[in-house]
Amino acid sequence: LLALVCTEARQERIEIGNRISENLPEIPAELIESLNQYQNTRGAGFAGWTTDGCLLISTRFAETAQAHRVCQPMGMREQLTFYKEPVGGILPSPANAWRPGFVFSKDKGGDEFSQLYWFDYPSRTTTLLTDGKRSQNGGTVLNEDGSLMAYSSTARNGTDRDIWLRDTKTGQS
């Protein structure tokens, strides 16, 4: 009788890496499936308003953030950029701008040399605004009519950040 009392109950032990689990029930497949709807969500970051009143956002799909716009309450997202690399620093043109679109930054292959680009709404084309070389560019601001763009860049020597001013009509910096 004493042997029965002293006998240790059999424990189910699972070791995965550094984690040791003992006597835990298996998680039902239905529970895992129902949790997916809460765990697989996408966030959206507010970037501003377009000149025609649409909401400009950055939304991450898979492993990369891209620019989207939403033009009505409860409306569908319309994806505007389609790159392998994430876009960031999205800045819409001001309400009084001479052309509709937005500035965004993007690097190549994770090289961290962010370049600035212009996305033109009417033509859906993208234009490189900075040197396209081994420089980091960002911190963009536009004046009231979008004719001048100020930004910081390491283009001069690759290290120090300078403030650059670009005429968006002529392309001169």
Regions found by a protein language model. Give the residues of each.
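Short, solvent-exposed loop/turn segments at conserved positions within beta-propeller repeat blades
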Residues: R60-A65, K108-S114, A155-R161
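Conserved beta-propeller blade repeats
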Residues: Q39-S58, K84-K106, L116, K133-S152, ...
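Multi-bladed beta-propeller domains
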Residues: Q11-G43, V70-G88, G109, F119-Q136, ...
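Residue-level signal for WD-repeat beta-propeller blades
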Residues: W49-T50, F61, C71, N96, ...
